[in-house]
Regions:
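Acidic, surface-exposed loops and disordered segments
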Residues: 1-205
Length: 205
């Protein structure tokens, strides 16, 4: 399956085979593909919480997740979080394979870009989560699996359950597995004419 096929065939699947297990090798392959996603300054803010404990998944589903079946039935349930302060934690490790002059340049830019801009740090973390999520879902599709991004859960309660560290932000979950029911037909995309702007927006006088 090529990239365009994965993009067009990816759907948000709700019903999964609860008995199907993704192998450890496949899980590793999915995660290694996910971390190929781009991040600003190559900071790689994401931290992936693999929700593997059946009791924990059941608790999230029943108490904080609106009883969404994919939370317990999918082979994998991954909660995306990100470290908003990753930019200041051993920054040279993000450029360990780059020429020294390149690493020096980027690391010296990194501090002033983020320093004192809490809103930007949070935005960058969430942007990184979004790109990693899409990478994961496309990789899953290419490997013959389906996925579902989910934000319909009590973020604060789940953050407590997983002991979310200070300075981390919560993102959505992604369920991955073998579907047992076809999703609804695609609801339809807006026409490009509604979405694409050439150069500038029109002024409204």
């Amino acid at each position: 399956m090529n990239t365009l096929e994965a993009i067009y065939q990816r759907r948000s699947v709700k019903a999964y085979d609860p008995n199907y297990q993704i192998t450890p090798e496949e899980e590793q392959k999915l995660l290694e593909a996910t971390i190929q996603a781009p991040t600003s300054f190559n900071i790689q803010h994401w931290r992936f919480v693999i929700l593997r404990d059946p009791e924990l998944r059941q608790k999230i589903r029943k108490e904080f997740g609106n009883d969404q079946a994919q939370m317990t039935d999918a082979s994998l349930l991954i909660l995306f979080t990100a470290d908003t302060k990753a930019w200041q934690k051993e920054p040279y490790r993000y450029w360990q394979n780059a020429p020294q002059e390149v690493a020096d340049l980027l690391v010296n830019w990194m501090g002033p870009f983020h320093q004192g801009r809490e809103w930007l740090q949070r935005d960058e973390a969430q942007r990184s989560i979004g790109m990693a999520m899409q990478t994961l879902m496309l990789a899953a599709k290419a490997m013959g699996y389906d996925s579902c991004p989910m934000i319909g859960f009590d973020i604060d309660k789940v953050a407590e359950l997983i002991n979310l560290p200070d300075d981390y932000v919560m993102g959505p979950m992604v369920a991955i597995g073998k579907k047992v029911k076809e999703p609804w037909p695609k609801p339809g995309q807006l026409p490009l004419s509604d979405l694409v702007v050439e150069n500038t927006f029109s002024r409204k006088d």
